Amino acid sequence: MGNTCGVTLRSKYFASFRGASQRHDEAGYAPVATSAAAAAAADEPAGKKAPRGSAAAADAPHAASMKRGAPAPAELTANVLGHPTPSLSEHYALGRKLGQGQFGTTYLCTDLATGVDYACKSIAKRKLITKEDVEDVRREIQIMHHLAGHRNVVAIKGAYEDPQYVHIVMELCAGGELFDRIIERGQFSERKAAELTRIIVGVIEACHSLGVIHRDLKPENFLLANKDDDLSLKAIDFGLSVFFKPGQVFTDVVGSPYYVAPEVLRKCYGPEADVWTAGVILYILLSGVPPFWAETQQGIFDAVLKGVIDFDSDPWPVISDSAKDLIRRMLNPRPKERLTAHEVLCHPWICDHGVAPDRPLDPAVLSRIKQFSAMNKLKKMALRVIAESLSEEEIAGLKEMFKAMDTDNSGAITYDELKEGMRKYGSTLKDTEIRDLMEAADVDNSGTIDYIEFIAATLHLNKLEREEHLVAAFSYFDKDGSGYITVDELQQACKEHNMPDAFLDDVIKEADQDNDGRIDYGEFVAMMTKGNMGVGRRTMRNSLNISMR
């Protein structure tokens, strides 16, 4: 991750794909996937206690990122923090798993002295492959300490290191995600949106004033510390954040498609990109949809670069002119003309006792937010089903390719094997771009690509071209073979994949084109092939420059 102008490509375009087979699910080698529990157990810190308690929290997955440079020297990974630390187990007891990230897993943990619960992110040191990986972990901890004391930034309690892991103990955010809370409330107003935006932009202002760019702002990275307090919002996940100096230019492509600023796509940006992203979040808060939307990832990029904002469709005719003025200023495509975080906080619509109306927004906006959040969850689950249901005949070519790359016949492709294999297939990718693909396909965060991961990656990135894949997924959900997917069947599938089943009614409504309360095959295909859940310019398929059929 560069602080200077060296051209690298670091994108989160597989964040959604990673969730397709996994946010919480893992796959194993064979042609048959292993269980999620077994795979997860393989990456748990030694001494982890059995699951206990029911406190809820989440740690947004680290972005799939592209690394530069040579492998990390052994002395670096042996001593990531650069100084000795006490043993984590002397002070905390690990509990149940809360979330899975790019480099590690977050657990509930309890302070042995006080009984207070915290969240502990355990980062597997074996996944810190390059010197930049090690520097990223150090910098994340440094930035969390640097921002300590801000009431809307998750508080770090301490960092610990043992031979296998780096552990970051932090404040537990048990209130859930921002959008989930909005949906739960059932009522939302411009004034409430102004209050939340004031918090989000306040975090940005604090970061920028302390020389930090967050670079990964999105609703999932704002959690509520307390489910009973709508304003207990906390910014989390500083894994992509960087220190900056005034005038410094960054070229790393990071972010998610809906939220990425145009100058990030152009690989020349600074702290202004955070304000753009906050503007996108505000637009979604008020309308339930992102301002830059298209059926494909490239279409989204084109829309972002074009910068045309829709204020004509519902509900915008009844949204205040002041709100629209603020959004226009936050989404100014010219970074130097965009409002700064401080200027946003001084805008009449957002400041204390400002002009934001208190009347409830159209209920349709809440519905759209629910659909925007829930639909991806079903797609992700379906993609895993497809990857695990392929027959030997269907994947014979891919299996041979996997075997050709797996030169030591270990059942997993290492970074070096992938790099050599890509070049054998005529790829001209830079090492950093290959690293990005490696991390994208490694859904179980093992540091290698196993058989099912390879198949799942090529299937997803091939945009589900084979109809039989879709038939297999549809049949999986259609438990009774009726030709329709019902809410009950989706609930059962969610249980099987350890996924939340909230808002499935909204998934049905979104896909149900004939309004009969269920999803037929045609509607399912339309849902699965609409849009794209990932972002990025490189895929395993087009990088190999061969047919994946």
UniProtKB/Swiss-Prot annotation:
Q: Please name the top-level EC class of this enzyme.
A: transferase
- Which ranges carry the EF-hand domain? 393-428, 429-464, 465-500, 501-534
User: Which residues carry out catalysis?
Assistant: 216 (proton acceptor)
> Which reaction(s) are listed as its catalytic activity?
L-seryl-[protein] + ATP = O-phospho-L-seryl-[protein] + ADP + H(+); L-threonyl-[protein] + ATP = O-phospho-L-threonyl-[protein] + ADP + H(+)
Q: What EC identifiers does the entry list? A: 2.7.11.1
Q: Name one Pfam family in it.
A: EF-hand_7
Q: Where in the cell is it found?
A: Membrane
Q: Where is the lipid attached (N-myristoyl glycine)?
A: 2
Q: Which residues form the Protein kinase domain?
A: 92-350
Which keywords has UniProt assigned to this entry?
ATP-binding, Calcium, Kinase, Lipoprotein, Membrane, Metal-binding, Myristate, Nucleotide-binding, Repeat, Serine/threonine-protein kinase, Transferase
Biological process annotations from GO: intracellular signal transduction
- The UniProt annotation places Ca(2+) 4 binding at 512, 514, 516, 518, 523
Q: Which InterPro entries match?
A: CDPK_Ser/Thr_kinases, EF-hand-dom_pair, EF_Hand_1_Ca_BS, EF_hand_dom, Kinase-like_dom_sf, Prot_kinase_dom, Protein_kinase_ATP_BS, Ser/Thr_kinase_AS
Residue numbers binding Ca(2+) 3? 478, 480, 482, 484, 489
Q: How does it sit in the membrane?
A: Lipid-anchor
Task: Give me the residues that bind Ca(2+) 1, please.
Answer: 406, 408, 410, 417
Which of this chain's residues are annotated to bind ATP? 98-106, 121
State the Gene Ontology terms under molecular function.
ATP binding; calcium ion binding; calcium-dependent protein serine/threonine kinase activity; calcium/calmodulin-dependent protein kinase activity; calmodulin binding; protein serine kinase activity
According to the record, the residues making up region (Disordered) are: 43-69
Identify the GO cellular component terms for this protein.
Answer: cytoplasm; membrane; nucleus
User: What function does the entry list?
Assistant: May play a role in signal transduction pathways that involve calcium as a second messenger.
Q: Which family does it belong to?
A: Belongs to the protein kinase superfamily. Ser/Thr protein kinase family. CDPK subfamily.
Provide the domain comment: There are 3 contiguous domains conserved in the CDPK subfamily: a kinase domain, an autoinhibitory (junction) domain and a calmodulin-like domain. The autoinhibitory domain (356-386) inactivates kinase activity under calcium-free conditions.
Name listed for the protein in its UniProt record: Calcium-dependent protein kinase 5
